[in-house]
């Protein structure tokens, strides 16, 4: 007998990965409930759409649920998980629920260590401009849509594929993107980089024979796995052997201008409303998919020129008064791995040439700080001024040799930047007020609670006005 599902409960519904799936299910007509430790804009939006939201985790919250959705971040002793197990309610992993949504449509899954959210957003935006009206589930808020998910009427669903817990192996899309492969979340793979690369190969094996793997050939680790991909491959990037390639790249006024070369097609002049070479690569993935699906060149050009970005991905907050009577440019970014951070710093240098770059950085996870310690020191040493916070633990036990103080000491030993260390992220606005000067570019960066700092700075200014 088929198990009838009417109500679906999400444990940790306010998270980026969970909320998007929940929103799509609400729009499909399911009764959706969920719990989280605190309210945020995402839970408020879901509640307005009709979801039932509880603050705090309690067994009573799953009342009436026919399925309970969890992510790998949810502990097995969570009271709602225990209640579901006791009551015989199916417990479904987030990626499995995403896979079920993909079964309803043709899936386009975006994978890679870095750039998933921006690339997913670019693909969704270009397909929408081409009239394909895709469903999308994104790990950040697509600013033009005001949400991180949307139920479209078209045949495609565009979603991020998460390698951090190997859950992307639950997905069976028809098109896959691999942006890059880097050493992150290595606990999942037993600290064996070969196992991580093998997981990406296995990911491509989920494609049907008529599917395609769209891969960034600029990344050496992606290039290494191409011979082991048994499905059709489309190579994109800046490399000469890329089938979808960018040439004549020019950074101007915070935008990237370039020409796209595609096999059998006329060159396409593109203006991308994002800075940085890494975003040129991300846009090429979207162009490759859009071209394959028959989106017109005019629609591709329009979507990229008008792209408004994603929340916390080089998100601009405008000009902010500085303590010396001038003003500085405030930007917020989700970067938390040295490779991502280096790309964002390079993008900022290209978008704002000659201006002093101030970074406020909150490291994310002690294990990542430990594993990438020297790389963090190197990238943080490339900015002109630095405010550094204690590590955002994300549930991990503290590691004294990889905390904020240890990172500060290592940076001072190198001697290229003298960090201002603050123990709490709440102290970042005051620290920035003492560092930022007229004409500076200030970036708040990290995957933890520092994401709330720019809004606090802007709110403080509005209250003083």
UniProtKB/Swiss-Prot annotation:
GO terms for molecular function: ATP binding; UDP-N-acetylmuramate-L-alanine ligase activity. Its EC number is 6.3.2.8. Disulfide bonds: none annotated. Keywords: ATP-binding, Cell cycle, Cell division, Cell shape, Cell wall biogenesis/degradation, Cytoplasm, Ligase, Nucleotide-binding, Peptidoglycan synthesis. It is found in: Cytoplasm. Its main location: cytoplasm. Pathway: Cell wall biogenesis; peptidoglycan biosynthesis. One of its GO terms (cellular component) is cytoplasm. ATP binds at residues 112-118. It catalyses: UDP-N-acetyl-alpha-D-muramate + L-alanine + ATP = UDP-N-acetyl-alpha-D-muramoyl-L-alanine + ADP + phosphate + H(+). One of its GO terms (biological process) is cell wall organization. It is an enzyme of class 6 (ligase). InterPro entries: Mur-like_cat_sf, Mur_ligase_C, Mur_ligase_C_dom_sf, Mur_ligase_cen, Mur_ligase_N, MurCDEF_pg_biosynth, UDP-N-AcMur_Ala_ligase_MurC. It comes from the Bacteria. NCBIfam families: murC (TIGR01082). HAMAP family: MurC. Belongs to the MurCDEF family. Cell wall formation. This is UDP-N-acetylmuramate--L-alanine ligase. The lineage of its organism: Bacteria, Pseudomonadati, Pseudomonadota, Betaproteobacteria, Burkholderiales. The gene is murC.
């Amino acid at each position: 007998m088929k198990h009838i599902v009417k109500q679906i409960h999400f444990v940790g519904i306010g998270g980026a990965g969970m909320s998007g799936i929940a929103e799509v299910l609400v729009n499909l007509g399911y009764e959706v409930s969920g719990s989280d430790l605190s309210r945020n804009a995402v839970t408020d939006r879901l509640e307005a759409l009709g979801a039932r939201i509880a603050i705090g985790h309690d067994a009573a919250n799953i009342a009436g649920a026919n399925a309970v959705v969890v992510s790998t971040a949810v502990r097995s002793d969570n009271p709602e998980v225990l209640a579901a197990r006791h009551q015989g309610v199916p417990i479904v992993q987030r990626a499995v629920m995403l896979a079920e949504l993909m079964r309803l449509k043709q899936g386009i899954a975006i994978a890679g260590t870095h750039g998933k959210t921006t690339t997913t957003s670019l693909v969704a935006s270009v397909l929408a401009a081409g009239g394909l009206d895709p469903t999308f589930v994104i790990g950040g808020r697509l600013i033009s849509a005001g949400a991180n998910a949307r139920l479209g009427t078209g045949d495609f669903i565009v979603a991020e594929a998460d390698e951090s817990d190997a859950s992307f192996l639950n997905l069976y899309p028809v098109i896959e993107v691999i942006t890059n492969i880097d050493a992150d979340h290595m606990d999942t793979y037993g600290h064996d980089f070969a196992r991580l690369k093998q997981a990406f190969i296995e990911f491509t094996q989920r494609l049907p024979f008529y599917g395609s793997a769209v891969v960034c050939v600029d990344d050496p680790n992606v290039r290494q796995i191409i011979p082991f991909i048994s499905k059709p491959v489309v190579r994109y990037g800046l490399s000469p052997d890329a089938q979808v390639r960018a040439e004549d790249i020019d950074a101007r006024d915070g935008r990237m201008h370039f020409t796209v070369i595609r096999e059998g097609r006329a060159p396409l002049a593109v203006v991308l409303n994002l800075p940085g070479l890494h975003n040129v690569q991300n846009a090429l993935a979207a162009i490759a998919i859009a071209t394959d699906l028959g989106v017109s060149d005019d629609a591709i050009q329009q979507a990229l020129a008008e792209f408004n970005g994603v929340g916390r991905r080089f998100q601009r907050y405008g000009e902010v008064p500085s303590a010396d009577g001038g003003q500085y440019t405030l930007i917020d970014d989700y970067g938390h791995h040295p490779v991502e951070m280096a790309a964002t710093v390079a993008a900022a240098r290209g978008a704002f040439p000659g201006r002093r770059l101030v970074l406020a950085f909150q490291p994310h996870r002690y294990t990542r700080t430990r594993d990438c310690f020297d790389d963090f020191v190197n990238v943080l040493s490339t900015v002109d001024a630095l405010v550094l916070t204690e590590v955002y633990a994300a549930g991990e036990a503290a590691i004294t040799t990889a905390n904020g103080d240890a990172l500060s000491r290592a940076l001072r030993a190198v001697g290229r930047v003298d960090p201002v260390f603050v123990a709490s992220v709440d102290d970042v606005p005051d620290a920035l007020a003492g560092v930022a000067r007229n004409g500076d570019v200030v970036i708040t960066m990290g995957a933890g609670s520092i994401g709330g700092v720019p809004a606090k700075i802007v709110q403080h200014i509005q209250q003083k006005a």
